[in-house]
Amino acid sequence: MKFNTKINNLLIIALSTLMLSACSTAKKAGGGGAGDVYTGNDTVEYLASGVKDRVFFATNSSSLTTASRDTLRKQASYLRKNKKLNVVLEGHADERGTREYNLALGEKRANSAKDYLMTYGISGKRVSVISYGKEKPVNSASTPLAWSQNRRSVTIKAK
């Protein structure tokens, strides 16, 4: 009986330690203040070699930043060279706000990116838009850094 109690105590300690270690925080690569726009690379993937797949937005905004416009120019260049490739722009928001508000904001963000691609000669017929609002966060923490990573538009190759 004492042996089982010792094993149970050790198991509880081990599980508690494991759970606490899973709660470590991420480094603030891009600032991450409430109104900041995340520009770090830890959540960025690539549409093609050297062409980032996502752009980030300020809180409650669908306006493109200088960094976002630069990324979208590179995407447009890649798309001009790959004329058979179609893309989907996924609009996202952070967890704050209602589901409906965030779906609308995600759509505005994706459409801002689409409009910018179109100014660089990409046909709107090649670009689809979908909004996930706050439904698909890349970082589920409730922190300014997580929110800034989730305020994004992601460009993916259409299937």
Pin down the residues of each PLM region.
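Bacterial N-terminal signal peptides that target proteins for export
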Residues: K2-L11
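Extracytoplasmic/secreted proteins, especially bacterial periplasmic and envelope-associated proteins
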Residues: A67-K74, E100, K108, S112, ...
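A non-catalytic structural micro-motif
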Residues: K84-H92, E107-V138, R151-K159
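Short beta-alpha junctions and helix-cap segments that line functional grooves
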Residues: S140-T143
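A generic structural micro-feature
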Residues: L145-Q149
